[in-house]
Amino acid sequence: MEEIMLKLMKYELRKQAFSKLIILAIALLGEIMFFTGFIMDKSETIGLALGLLSLFTVGALFFIAFESIMTFQSDLKQKHSYMLFLTPNTTYSIIGAKVISSALQIMLSGLAFALLFIMDGAVLLAKYSSLNEINRALKEFVNLQFNINLDYKYLVLVILVILVTWITIITLSYLSITLSATFLADKRGKSFISFVIFFIMIISIGKLEDFLLFALGINAINDTSLIVGILFHVVVTIIAYITTAWMLDKKVSV
């Protein structure tokens, strides 16, 4: 089972490898721009590089999620891709490989960008001592205004929440696309219906998470609320994965 999953994951990663190389190349260009400004002591270049890298990070994560969703949709629509679901591999293995591959891409990309910003920040703090004062003042301001202790542990949890939420959204997209291709296959406006269902699921999950935090007596954004959020989205992702695989298993095996 593990060997089959690994083969399927390699297949998924190979299909989307080229775009990741482009993302890596653009990120490296941003870093070259940053260190050029750093070496030449040009604050405008440093600021521009960090600003562009920030925008690119958000755009890259959006693109990775979008590409994963579109690849899955293509696999269900195109005959040569759809044949994958007719192989001896179970739909649970195939969908599992897709979910894990998407999760790996999101997590590794997020980690890579986070490390870049940590490295850039450390370099700046080492050279410009005044930034340490700004950093300390910013932490105090956030703590006073929002009652949030802005430490490294908290930032890591925030990054994890964002990445896990993206993985949940991708898996829910798989579910809605599968619904459109299976149980709604003969219905008019199936794409629109599945799109509406997707947004209803997103809103409902958000409300359910708020209710869960309220039920647990968590009224502030802190480490505990972030950990609960991560665990909640992991459970939602697992449920969406099982439901997606079940729907495909029922329809493809018929």
Give a label for each model feature:
Residues 1-80, 91-254:
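Hydrophobic alpha-helical transmembrane segments of membrane proteins
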